[in-house]
Amino acid sequence: MAVSARDYWDLTKPKVVALIVFTALVGMFLAIPDMPTWLQVRTGALGFLGIWLAASAAAAINQLLDAKIDAQMARTSWRPLVVGKVRPWQVLVFAGALIVISMTILVVWVNVITAVLTFASLIGYAVIYTVYLKRATSQNIVIGGLAGATPPMLGWAAVTGLPTSADWINASLLVLIIFIWTPPHFWALAIFRRADYAKAAIPMLPVTHGVPHTRKQILVYTVLLAIVTLAPVAVGMSGVFYLGGAIVLNAVFLWYAWRMLNPPDELFSMKMFGYSIVYLMALFAFLMVDHLLLPWVR
């Protein structure tokens, strides 16, 4: 049976990658204080493409290495490799091609630092997290979350090359936001899917430490997140428009986290999971709008 374009598309986890590259795009915008030059626009577009291809490759490798686990979990049992729509060698060739194209674009037309950071993130997620951390510790998503948190820095690097300590610090603050956001986001899903993780012998926190403990950890990280998201304002990266949006978004997220301690039903964790995605997209949208469209409110 021939492999369809949709099968290859599904290997890239397009919804997940869309959120990843959106945060990279915001990083690009925030890195440029004024109107971008034509060179910055061209470099940014090529950087966006390279980061997107690398993230897609990482997703495909993750599915290749996690095929046996995916087959045991209802959430992932439909994936192309699991149901036999594609073969392992086809996934490997596809991912390899994406990596080669991505690295070529980044090295030749963007800059070496972006290529190095992007490749390191790819290895961090597709290999270190998938092969080792995911199966080794209940803190898998905390430690491994760093690889998934780097896209804003990758975007920042693409248009600037990170020439100053201020660039590194500001880009790192955006990384920190996603890093702290990842545990409550993923643990909300893990609570609902804990039986699947237990069946697949994946030591997610709800499996190893129980649901009540996980709910408390979600609240702790959500409080930390509310604090960390104030950092862009504290360093002068963002202004009152972003601050207002962040306050509202954090208030709702904190309500979800507090309500998770005594949820009304089993589905509530999935409602929080869904909101966490909206939260991150909206937060970074506020960062971008504040930076580009509303300088007069600063």
Curated annotation (Swiss-Prot):
The gene is cyoE. NCBIfam families: cyoE_ctaB, PRK04375.1-2. Carbon 2 of the heme B porphyrin ring is defined according to the Fischer nomenclature. One of its GO terms (molecular function) is protoheme IX farnesyltransferase activity. InterPro entries: Protohaem_IX_farnesylTrfase, UbiA_prenyltransferase, UbiA_prenylTrfase_CS, UbiA_sf. It catalyses: heme b + (2E,6E)-farnesyl diphosphate + H2O = Fe(II)-heme o + diphosphate. The chain crosses the membrane at residues 16-36, 45-65, 93-113, 114-134, 141-161, 172-192, 223-243, 244-264, 277-297. Pfam families: UbiA. Keywords: Cell inner membrane, Cell membrane, Heme biosynthesis, Membrane, Transferase, Transmembrane, Transmembrane helix. Pathway: Porphyrin-containing compound metabolism; heme O biosynthesis; heme O from protoheme: step 1/1. It comes from Xanthomonas euvesicatoria pv. vesicatoria (strain 85-10) (Xanthomonas campestris pv. vesicatoria). Converts heme B (protoheme IX) to heme O by substitution of the vinyl group on carbon 2 of heme B porphyrin ring with a hydroxyethyl farnesyl side group. This is Protoheme IX farnesyltransferase. It is found in: Cell inner membrane. The lineage of its organism: Bacteria, Pseudomonadati, Pseudomonadota, Gammaproteobacteria, Lysobacterales. One of its GO terms (biological process) is heme O biosynthetic process.
